């Protein structure tokens, strides 16, 4: 199969405009992961580029299929000027490399934890993976390859992550919705969970 990354970058540019910054990270034993930054008014979006180069594989499979399997990139949207969110580049690259490093299949409803604040003084150490298809449409690839999904990431506080483990992703998203939580606020506090 042809290299999908130029198609992925074109889809990101079509949906989000021209990136105003990009950084690349390479971890030992993994392909290069780039993080592109797109600014739109008071919102800045960070999108990974490189996670979808290979399909995610079931870690229990004897051989990984080089064509079939889910493919994804990650997109994080936050308000500008509230916190130094550009430091999220490395944690995002770590999350994007997790399918190659840990054999993890990243899918909606999953929690991804980096163990440290996503950026300096951030109240968030993990993210909830949301459904694709909203901000950036899925990218169809030639059969038999699965489409590339652009999965939004919703930052979670440690308390929200613990609550999500007990009650589920949908319950946490409903809690955020009923409380009117601004999920793009990089300095927001945990939603009331009682």
Positions of predicted regions on the chain:
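Acidic, proline/glycine-rich low-complexity IDRs
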Residues: 1-71, 75-194
């Amino acid at each position: 199969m042809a290299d999908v990354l130029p198609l992925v970058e074109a889809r990101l540019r079509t949906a989000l405009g021209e990136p105003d910054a990009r950084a690349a990270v390479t971890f030992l034993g993994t392909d290069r992961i780039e993080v592109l930054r797109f600014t739109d008014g008071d919102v800045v979006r960070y999108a990974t580029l490189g996670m979808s180069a290979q399909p995610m594989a079931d870690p229990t499979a004897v051989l990984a299929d080089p064509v079939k399997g889910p493919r994804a990139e990650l997109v994080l949207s936050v308000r500008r000027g509230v916190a130094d969110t550009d430091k999220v580049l490395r944690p995002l690259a770590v999350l994007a490399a997790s399918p190659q490093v840990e054999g993890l299949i990243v899918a909606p409803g999953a929690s991804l934890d980096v163990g440290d604040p996503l950026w300096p003084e951030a109240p968030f150490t993990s993210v909830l993976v949301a459904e694709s298809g909203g901000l950036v449409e899925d990218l169809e690839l030639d059969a038999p390859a699965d489409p590339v999904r652009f999965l939004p990431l919703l930052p979670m506080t440690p308390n929200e992550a613990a609550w999500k483990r007990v009650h589920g992703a949908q319950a946490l998203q409903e809690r955020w919705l009923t409380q009117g939580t601004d999920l793009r606020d990089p300095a927001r506090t945990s939603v009331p969970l009682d």
